[in-house]
UniProtKB/Swiss-Prot annotation:
Pathway: Pyrimidine metabolism; CTP biosynthesis via de novo pathway; UDP from UMP (UMPK route): step 1/1. The gene is pyrH. This is Uridylate kinase. Homohexamer. UMP binds at G38, D60, F107, Q108, P109, G110, Q111, S112, T113. One of its GO terms (cellular component) is cytoplasm. Its main location: cytoplasm. It comes from Pyrobaculum islandicum (strain DSM 4184 / JCM 9189 / GEO3). It catalyses: UMP + ATP = UDP + ADP.
């Protein structure tokens, strides 16, 4: 089965975790697309640029280049990966035709890497998108604020969108946004959201398990 995996930029803040993800992906025999977030590098550079008065577009560009740097690092750990980081969907598809593993970061200002991951999943006709996130599942409310928040193992995109719009989900924008949801809904691609600190959850999904939250159309 074709896999598309969205790696939170926070994964790249833990050296051992990066290597663990590389091992899991190398062990998988099928085709894999990976989209990396910008992480701490992006946040730091954007903060400095914002303080200096840079436009939102310029701040987005810094985040994009940070995510591409993470992508290039990840490529260096994967023998079967395309050695070039695609910068748009056309370049991604070109690499996809030639390589077993293709890794990319952001594409353009105003577009999250969550949307990039959705576009990639759509373009390669992947049945599922695996989101290694900075939370372990989707909750009805922020569990840090409300300890009684309900963990939601299965939900629809419509239900998930309502939770996002209520602004109670931690890391919501990084997790998914309106554009990414619309792309995934129109293709009926199933998304699995799980704790990004546990790369073994990729293997769990492949075994038919649900280690976090499963979002369907």
């Amino acid at each position: 089965m074709t896999l598309v995996i969205k790696l939170s930029g926070r994964v790249f803040e833990d050296e051992e975790l990066i290597f663990k993800y590389a091992r899991v992906i190398k062990a998988y025999s099928g085709k894999v697309g990976v989209v990396t977030g910008g992480g701490e590098i992006a946040r730091r550079y954007i903060s400095i640029a914002k303080r200096g008065g840079a436009s939102y577009t310029f701040q987005d560009l810094l985040g994009i280049y940070a995510s591409r740097l993470n992508a290039l690092l990840f490529i260096s750990l994967l023998e079967d990966a395309c050695p070039i980081v695609p910068t748009n969907i056309e370049e991604f598809l070109d690499a996809w035709r030639r390589c077993r593993i293709t890794v990319t970061g952001g594409f353009q200002p105003g577009q999250s890497t969550a949307t990039v991951a959705a576009l990639v999943a759509e373009a390669v006709k992947a049945p599922v998108l695996l989101n290694a996130a900075n939370i372990d599942a989707v909750y009805s409310e922020d569990p840090k604020i409300n300890p009684n928040a309900k963990r939601l193992p299965v939900l629809t995109y419509d239900e998930f969108e309502r939770i996002l719009k209520s602004s109670v989900l931690p890391g919501g924008y990084e997790l998914m946004d309106t554009w990414s949801i619309s792309i995934l809904k129109r293709n009926c691609i199933t998304t699995y959201i799980f704790d990004g600190r546990k790369p073994e959850h990729i293997e769990a999904v492949m075994r038919g398990e649900n280690p976090g939250s499963k979002i369907t159309c």
